């Protein structure tokens, strides 16, 4: 890379506001024979004083811009929507001693103990004045004497693990750092636990340094010593560990980045582990063990996934539940049942099928009145199971089902203040994309809303990494629906809704399909007088942020507003930060591979923004401590879009301080920050689509 040290200040103006001055450098690099101009390359040092000051100025701009908008009203509705009481399902399970609880007033859930000695075990609300120290994982030792738990600081992916004595409720002084993407797995004798650890990054690059060389460590709780348990020479591998038969045998899941393929190692010590699944040929997910072998959900020779068993005796793979027409998303072993969750193609909701553990389909079914995303199956006695259900407009419900009596009881329901599920409608259908492929879409609205060509539309999609978007309730959309808007969710290609083939149709050389699918979702709604393109705000996060950014620049001034969040906006240099190298399964390796470079440069939002083109009103959001998709992606894209914007449509940035990659859960940001972020997004959208 070379730098021509010519620096000047760029200021963009409109009739109503003035963008902060932004430094521009003549920076370029040559890649595969192509000169790539990168005038905002310096923003990759996103913790520099200049970048922080620039971000603060952008935050001030968006807040000033929204002073005369719906933001106060939206904040009020969302504050009420986020004030519901919450219990985790374990509260209703007689075999569980601990649960999560929130009265509605707390920023984070409390971790509680049930019974006569009921008590608050962990209260993350007391850990930091701004509520940005957050509880992540909890794991209780087999002897129930100890609790190991992990903490996130300001939304980053890095975790610190601490240890508590459950008899005294006192911390024991153990503190393990440099933990990331890790479970906490106890040894059967409760002498310690296993976790994933990375080499310590340089302090100045902690949020951006590439993460390699993960290894499994054992924490001895008596000595406090951290001992290396397993680590291979491949720097790109990550692991999860399970123990079979009271620690007699070890099962290690070997994962390379976010590749869909993985493999498992098995043996009785780290020195004699051997692969028991095909190496990086398919996806395997361990779900259960019995005396004969290990059960896995896999797409090995089954695009829609199936349940298989690998025998201990000879590692032979036998089929338990064969592949069906619907994609298999999960299997829960509860009592004597293997309960399979399939995606119903008509509405993306759960189609639940009961099998015995030998794979025989049973004459058992949940009542037809239940419709939604069903999950969390637990045993509550020999014949009783517990589970949860929700949809886009139905907050969480917990049910108890007596299998022998076919008796269903609603045992708890989340009540969202000011929100009555009976007042809302969900419609699921399909639309034709550019190449004729039929794509599912679900749109929701308040029954009293007059749906017409001017109705505000919030159109969301993801489209990547085999992730299936299924109906689930989140309070963030309560204000949008309450104010007369429509929430539309498109299940575009790149996800896992229709199995492996659907994923393959939206990655690498087929990635353009996801942008076409998203655009044609908007066209479908407009053609059916469900809003119009100018009353539509398009939204997506992470890979979905890329989706919004690319759809935006490929279709200038088409939408009413665009809301790319924590998106991968530089599709050339994403591999150079934290876990970016692990996204090659969907994005390729543009720095190393010429074909990947030539493809990605055409769909990269940062590189495809053109001078003097009028783009739709755009609010890009990120987290200043996002160490997964680093904020420089959003900074660079915003700077270039502000520079090149060819009309007075606003181009703005909101950078949530002390926040990381996620927004829908408390691990990434506390409740008050979520309300602030969602209020800004929706206020920006409404202000622009109403003009």
Identify what each model region corresponds to.
Residues 120-184, 190:
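A conserved hydrophobic secondary-structure block that centers on an alpha-helix together
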Residues 492-691:
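Active-site-proximal cap/loop segments of hydrolase catalytic domains
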Residues 11-12:
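C-terminal motif of bacterial Sec signal peptides marking the signal peptidase cleavage site
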Residues 112-114, 162-167, 210-222, 264-268, ...:
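Beta-propeller blade signature
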Residues 125-138, 151-155, 170, 403-406, ...:
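Cap/lid segment of the alpha/beta-hydrolase catalytic domain
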Residues 97-99, 144-147, 192-193, 250, ...:
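Hydrophobic beta-strand positions that form the internal "hydrophobic ladder"
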Residues 49, 53-139, 150, 237-266, ...:
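Non-catalytic accessory segments flanking enzyme active sites
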Residues 152-153, 196-212, 343:
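Short, conserved, GDST-rich strand-edge loop motifs in beta-rich repeat architectures
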């Amino acid at each position: 890379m070379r730098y021509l040290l010519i620096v000047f200040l760029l200021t963009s103006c409109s009739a109503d506001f003035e963008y902060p001055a932004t430094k521009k450098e003549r920076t370029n690099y040559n890649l595969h024979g192509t000169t790539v101009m990168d005038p905002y390359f310096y923003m990759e040092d996103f913790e520099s004083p200049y970048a922080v000051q620039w971000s603060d100025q952008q935050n001030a701009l968006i807040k000033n811009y929204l002073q005369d908008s719906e933001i106060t009203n939206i904040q009020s509705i969302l504050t009420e929507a986020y004030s519901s009481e919450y219990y985790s399902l374990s509260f209703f399970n007689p075999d569980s001693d601990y649960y999560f609880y929130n009265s509605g007033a707390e920023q984070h859930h409390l971790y509680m103990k049930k019974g006569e000695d009921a008590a608050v075990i962990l209260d993350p609300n007391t850990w930091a004045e701004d509520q940005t120290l957050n509880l992540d994982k909890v794991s209780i030792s087999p002897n129930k004497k100890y609790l190991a738990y992990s903490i996130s600081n300001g939304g980053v992916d890095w975790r610190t693990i601490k240890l508590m004595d459950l008899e005294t409720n006192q911390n024991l002084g153990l503190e393990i750092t440099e933990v990331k993407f890790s479970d906490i797995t106890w040894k059967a004798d409760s002498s310690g636990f296993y976790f994933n650890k990375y080499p310590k990054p340089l302090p100045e690059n902690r949020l951006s340094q590439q993460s390699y060389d993960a290894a499994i460590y054992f924490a001895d709780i008596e000595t406090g010593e951290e001992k290396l348990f397993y680590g291979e020479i491949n720097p790109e591998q990550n692991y999860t560990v399970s123990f079979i038969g009271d620690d007699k045998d070890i099962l290690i899941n070997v994962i390379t980045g976010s590749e869909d393929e993985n493999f498992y190692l098995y043996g009785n010590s780290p020195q004699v582990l051997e692969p028991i699944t095909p190496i990086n040929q398919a996806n395997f997910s361990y779900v259960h063990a019995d005396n004969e072998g290990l059960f896995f959900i896999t797409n090995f020779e089954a695009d829609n996934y199936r349940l298989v068993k690998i025998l201990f005796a000879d590692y032979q793979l036998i089929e338990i539940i064969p592949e069906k027409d619907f994609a298999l998303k999960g299997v829960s072993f509860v009592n004597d049942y293997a309960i399979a969750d399939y995606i119903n193609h008509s509405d993306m909701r759960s189609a639940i099928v009961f099998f015995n553990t030998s794979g025989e389909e049973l004459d058992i079914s949940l009542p037809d009145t239940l419709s939604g995303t069903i999950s969390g199956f637990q045993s509550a006695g020999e014949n009783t199971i517990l589970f949860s259900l929700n949809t886009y407009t139905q907050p969480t419900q917990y049910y108890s089902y007596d299998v022998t009596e076919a008796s269903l009881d609603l045992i708890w329901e989340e009540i969202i203040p000011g929100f009555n599920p009976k007042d809302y409608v969900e419609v699921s259908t399909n639309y034709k994309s550019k190449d004729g492929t039929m794509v599912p879409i679900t749109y929701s609205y308040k029954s009293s809303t007059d749906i017409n060509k001017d109705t505000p539309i919030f159109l969301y999609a993801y489209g990547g990494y085999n992730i299936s978007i299924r109906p689930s309730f989140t309070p963030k959309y309560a204000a949008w629906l309450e104010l007369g808007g429509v929430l539309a969710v498109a299940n575009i290609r790149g996800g896992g809704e229709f199995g492996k083939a659907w994923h393959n149709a939206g990655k690498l050389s087929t990635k353009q399909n996801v942008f076409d699918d998203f655009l044609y979702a908007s066209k479908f709604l407009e053609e059916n007088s469900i809003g119009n393109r100018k009353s539509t705000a398009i939204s997506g996060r992470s890979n979905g942020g890329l989706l919004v950014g690319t759809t935006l620049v490929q279709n200038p001034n088409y939408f009413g507003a665009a809301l790319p969040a924590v998106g991968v906006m530089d599709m050339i240099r994403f591999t150079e930060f934290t876990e970016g190298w692990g996204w090659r399964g969907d994005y390729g390796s543009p720095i190393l591979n010429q074909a990947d470079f030539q493809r990605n440069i055409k769909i990269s939002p940062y590189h495809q923004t053109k001078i003097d083109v009028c783009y739709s009103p755009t609010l890009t959001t990120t987290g200043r401590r996002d160490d997964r998709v680093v904020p420089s992606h959003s900074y660079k894209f915003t700077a270039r879009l502000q520079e090149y914007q060819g009309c007075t449509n606003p181009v703005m940035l909101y950078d949530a301080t002390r926040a990381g990659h996620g927004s829908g859960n408390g691990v990434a940001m506390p409740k008050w920050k979520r309300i602030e972020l969602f209020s800004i997004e929706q206020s920006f959208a409404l202000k622009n689509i109403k003009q």
